[in-house]
């Protein structure tokens, strides 16, 4: 499994991408250096991604700050100590709160190893993650990208990526998930860097801030 560990890995991946697909060169020139955005694997990393889903970056960070315990990091055990209605105070949806509770229970019981899962091949890891109720392909893919450092993951169902790829490459219509997954094959084995590139395009050129993790 190719792993992204630092900014140099992102730069290397981008260099390879520009050789694989010259159409990306003007996009890369427009957006500048790509963000690393790595987080530690584990409950907090996955929880942050779930909190960030389908909300603006500012909203996600406000919710996340309210969730952080005063005396340390947000562990599965710490999450389970919150009172049952705490999700309302945090600003979470009930669905997200229920998903986080199920994940926290699995991690705390030892039945789910989120760090070890990152060491598995992408297909196997994605299968385990999406087997958790409330965790869909987007959440699983983004976790492997930003907490596992997997270099060859592309969340083709992400609407921001669909819009960005369609606009940046001058496509006649926004590509849907199946078409975008096929299109992204040319960017393997650095599809996670390609996703960073198009998310950066979405943020800087399309003036939107719904980027998966801060």
Indicate where each model-derived feature is located:
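Phosphate-handling catalytic interfaces
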Residues: 47
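Short, contiguous, helix-prone interaction/anchoring segments in small proteins
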Residues: 41-42
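Alpha-helical ds-nucleic-acid-binding substructure associated with the helix-hairpin-helix region
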Residues: 4, 23, 27, 55-133
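C-terminal accessory module of base-excision DNA glycosylases/AP lyases that mediates lesion recognition
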Residues: 1-34, 98, 122-123, 137-214
